[in-house]
């Protein structure tokens, strides 16, 4: 891990606090988050992405806006329960990420997780992300079974992705289920990519 100077650490802290405040402005009354400030509709992927950031920030000691996280949790659980598979939109990946964030927050929706797992034709990204959710709740055997049936999807444009984002998510899942050799291989590939001058998405 890199040790930051005090000035750099203060800068990081300031930026995280500013991000939390700015993202909160995008939260709707139903608890979801819109893509843009002033938006009228929640974006499923963005809602999970912001919630993921909230959880990690809170773990580091940052204070979240009052009530914001609970509203997000309520929204995520409602959407998880009401979700219906629409293969043409690839929304299985969005559901898997939603379920992962709920598990990460300590509020796993096991019923929704099991329903998604029972579908026969979900994407590689969805299976792998769902595997991470199962690993987080201690069901390592189920997680590994899902993980071992997956390959790396080349792209996921609908959800702002790339093969490198997918590899990073695969690396995390591998770590969660204890497959350190797989995780190390992807970490080396990602590190090499990050050290290059190639364009990478924000995710």
Annotate the PLM regions:
Residues 1-203:
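Large, well-folded core regions of big proteins
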């Amino acid at each position: 891990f890199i040790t930051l100077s005090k000035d750099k650490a203060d800068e990081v802290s300031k930026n995280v606090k500013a991000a939390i405040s700015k993202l909160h402005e995008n939260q709707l009354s139903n608890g979801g988050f819109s893509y843009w400030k002033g938006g009228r509709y929640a974006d499923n992927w963005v809602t999970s992405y912001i919630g993921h950031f909230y959880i990690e920030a809170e773990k580091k000691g940052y204070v979240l806006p009052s009530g914001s996280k609970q509203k997000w949790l309520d929204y995520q659980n409602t959407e998880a329960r009401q979700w219906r598979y629409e293969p043409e939109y690839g929304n299985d990946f969005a559901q898997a990420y939603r379920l992962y964030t709920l598990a990460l927050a300590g509020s796993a929706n096991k019923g929704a997780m099991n329903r998604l797992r029972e579908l026969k034709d979900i994407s590689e990204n969805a299976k792998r992300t769902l595997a991470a959710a199962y690993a987080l709740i201690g069901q390592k055997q189920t997680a590994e079974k899902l993980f071992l049936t997956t390959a790396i999807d080349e792209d996921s444009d609908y959800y702002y992705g790339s093969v490198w984002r997918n590899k990073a998510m695969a690396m995390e899942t591998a770590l969660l289920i204890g497959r350190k050799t797989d995780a190390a291989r992807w970490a080396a590939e990602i590190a090499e990519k990050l050290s290059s001058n190639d364009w990478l998405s924000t995710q």
